[in-house]
Amino acid sequence: MEQSIIEGVPGRYWHRLEDGRIQCDVCPRYCKLHEGQRGLCFVRARQNDQMLLTTYGRSSGFCIDPIEKKPLNHFLPGTPVLSFGTAGCNLTCKFCQNWDISKARALDRVQDKASPEAIAEAAVRSGCRSVAFTYNDPVIFLEYAIDVAQACRARGIKTVAVSAGYIAPEPRVEFFGHMDVANIDLKGFTEGFYKTLCSGKLSSVLETLEYLKHETNVWFEITTLLIPGENDSADEIEAESRWVMDRLGPDVPLHFTAFHPDWKMLDTPPTPPQTLKMARRIAIEAGLRYVYTGNIHDSVGQSTYCHGCGTTLIGRDWYDLTAWNLTADGRCGDCGVPCAGVFDAGHGYWGARRQPVRVQAVANS
């Protein structure tokens, strides 16, 4: 049992149990803690008989990315987004592509410090249209994320949650009530996959997706990392695609991205490009209008097409925009059919750059 806990701020969503433990109610794990213990996420801890968030105001680093890297293809294309994460995660994915951050167990990994107001100010001064909570799941630092979102909204900056959607019903309402945009990682489409490789439950993620679609105005897209031999069968891809079509509708963008050997799955080979292209074809045949490939060079699979006439609406080459055929109100320039998403009259010009940022320095400049 760990007795030394770093400073933190009081956390929300917990209650006392009759046996003296306290239960964290942020995610479906419902960790039950004695004094001095941390939850599985590592950043929510019991100290002095209350729940603390130990990473408030601390980050593993800030960087300006292209919005397409989140990935988000239907939200202010071409614009820069100020991205950051903290440490820890409430899933245990053996294939984690950001394991050095999400699996961090030494809080010296989060040395960059910034207040919510400083982050919002840095976004404005850097010309970013949005701030993204990414690299690790913002659900576990929801108090910090919500405060940042409120500061950003006051400055006209949108907020983006890149999340696995593994959150309990009550905090789900508050958390997404402060977000403008989300990309939800739908990691597989069987309970066996979630249990074996993530120590989680598929059903909880599907509940989040249906909540976002039917009970919020959050623009969201879905990403599935296809792992050879684990979640890449044609049957599973078809089942996922049909579920998205039936429960969420044809306009929710779906990204199939390539796995590379990492964390505890170093012996698993990278995803072949043909698997991603197969998945895209299956999803389109299921009725989805906006299906993308990622982590490979595939300009066809990364571009956006009109579902009315088939013309290219947004051409992409990696993170660079190569074509734009949308009207000021987000319609096809050829046939006038609307394209689902959040668009300006034109696109941004950030390109593929990735620029590290010292938030306090920028905010104080």
How should these model regions be labeled?
Residues 1-35, 229-365:
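Auxiliary Fe-S-binding modules of radical SAM enzymes
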Residues 1-79:
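Flexible, acidic/Gly-rich N-terminal and inter-domain linker regions that tether
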Residues 24, 33, 42-43, 54-58, ...:
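Generic structural "secondary-structure junction" signal
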Residues 26, 40-43, 88-91, 95, ...:
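Short, cysteine/histidine-rich loop/knuckle motifs that typically chelate Zn2+
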Residues 30-54, 98-108, 315-319, 339-346:
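Iron-sulfur (Fe-S) cluster-binding segments and ferredoxin-like electron-carrier domains
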Residues 37, 89, 190:
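A generic "binding-loop/recognition-motif" signal
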Residues 46-181, 350-358:
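Conserved Radical SAM active-site core
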Residues 113-274, 279:
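Conserved AdoMet/S-adenosylmethionine-binding subsite of the radical SAM
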